Amino acid sequence: MNTADFDFHLPEELIAQTPLEKRDASKLLIVNRETGEMQDKHFHSIIDMLEPGDALVMNDTRVLPARLYGQKVETGGHVELLLLKNTSGDEWEVLAKPAKRLKVGTRISFGDGRLSAVVTEELTHGGRIVRFEYQGIFLEVLESLGEMPLPPYIHEKLDDRERYQTVYAKESGSAAAPTAGLHFTKELLAEIQAKGVHLVYLTLHVGLGTFRPVSVDNLDEHEMHSEFYQLSEEAAATLRSVKKNGGRVIAVGTTSIRTLETIGSKFDGQIQADSGWTNIFIKPGYEWKVVDAFSTNFHLPKSTLVMLVSAFAGRELVLDAYHHAIQEHYRFFSFGDAMFIY
C-alpha cells in the first residue's frame, strides 16, 4: 500500500485550536466495523458502549514542559531546546535551534541559572545529546522553566497547561499528550468504574515522531520512531482475567493500542508485564493480538495513526468515517473530537 492511499482533504477551520470548556462535551463518532453503521453522539455516551467485565486501558503518561529557552554561556546567543527523551541519568536527546551553532562542549544557561546544559554529542537533523546540571529535582526545575510543546498545527496559546494533560496523567516523560484521553473527566471515569468496567493504566511516553509525516511512498519503507512503554504485573493480571472471562480489552488511544499490541506480539498473543522500547508500525494486514475496540481522535492525513485505525476497521470505512466527520463539522486533531470503533 502507498502513503497516498491514506490522504484526504481537511478544511483548515476544522483543526481544533483550543480545548472545549468541558472535556466530555466533545462529539463522538461511533463506528461499527462489521456493519459500517455510524452514529453521531457526545463523548459522555462512550459509557453506553462499555459492558460490565470489560477493561478500559489508558495511558497515564504526563507531558513534560519540554521546550526550554536559554542562552549560550560564552556569547549570550539565544538557544531553543526541545526535550525528546531521557537517554541516561541527566542526559537527554533534544532538538536544538539553531543547531549548527551548538557544537560539543557548548554550555547553555536557562532562566536564572538554576538549570544549565552542556552539549555532549551531535546527532543528525538538529538533534543533540545534552547533559543537564541543576540544583534540586530535575522535573520540578523543568516545570518552572519549561513551556508545553504544543503540536505544530496549534497556533493558539494554551491558557491552562493542564488542559493538555489527561486527568489521570502521572508518569512524566512525554513530548505530546495521549490525546484520546483528554475527553475523560474524573466523574465520567467514576461512572464507568461503577458500571463494572475495569480501569487499567499503562505508560507509553509519546515522542515527537507521532507528528512526523510519512516521507516515503511505499509503507514498507517507513521507519517508525521508538517510544518507551511499561505495563505492570497488576495491570497485566487484570487484562488476562478480563480476556479469560469473556470481557473486551478497550484501548483509549493509539498509544495504548501500540503498547498492548507490542506486548501481544512479543508474547505470542499473551498479556505479560513488560517494559522496553517499541517501534511497532500497525498498518492494514496486521493481525490483532489483544485489542477488541478503541477510542481515538481524528488524525492527520497520510499519518501512521490513520493507517493504524485502518488496520482495525478497513481503509475504506475509515476514510468514509472521516468524510462523514468533515461533513458534520467534527473538530480534528489533538484538541478535537473522538471516534469509537468496535
From Swiss-Prot:
Any GO BP annotation: tRNA wobble guanine modification
Tell me the subunit arrangement.
Answer: Monomer.
Its Enzyme Commission number(s) read 2.4.99.17
The entry's localization annotation reads: Cytoplasm
Quote the protein name from its UniProt record.
S-adenosylmethionine:tRNA ribosyltransferase-isomerase
Q: What is its main location?
A: cytoplasm
Q: Which Pfam families does the UniProt record give?
A: Queuosine_synth (PF02547)
Q: Which domain of life is it from?
A: Bacteria
Q: In which pathway does it act?
A: tRNA modification; tRNA-queuosine biosynthesis
Q: What does this protein do?
A: Transfers and isomerizes the ribose moiety from AdoMet to the 7-aminomethyl group of 7-deazaguanine (preQ1-tRNA) to give epoxyqueuosine (oQ-tRNA).
| Gene encoding the protein | queA
Give the NCBIfam families listed for this entry.
PRK00147.1 (NF001140), queA (TIGR00113)
Swiss-Prot/TrEMBL keywords: Cytoplasm, Queuosine biosynthesis, S-adenosyl-L-methionine, Transferase
Q: Name one GO cellular component term.
A: cytoplasm
Disulfide bridge partners, by residue number: none
Task: Supply one GO molecular-function term.
Answer: S-adenosylmethionine:tRNA ribosyltransferase-isomerase activity
Catalytic activity, per the record?
A: 7-aminomethyl-7-carbaguanosine(34) in tRNA + S-adenosyl-L-methionine = epoxyqueuosine(34) in tRNA + adenine + L-methionine + 2 H(+)
Q: Which InterPro entries match?
A: QueA, QueA_dom1, QueA_dom2, QueA_sf
Its family remark reads: Belongs to the QueA family.
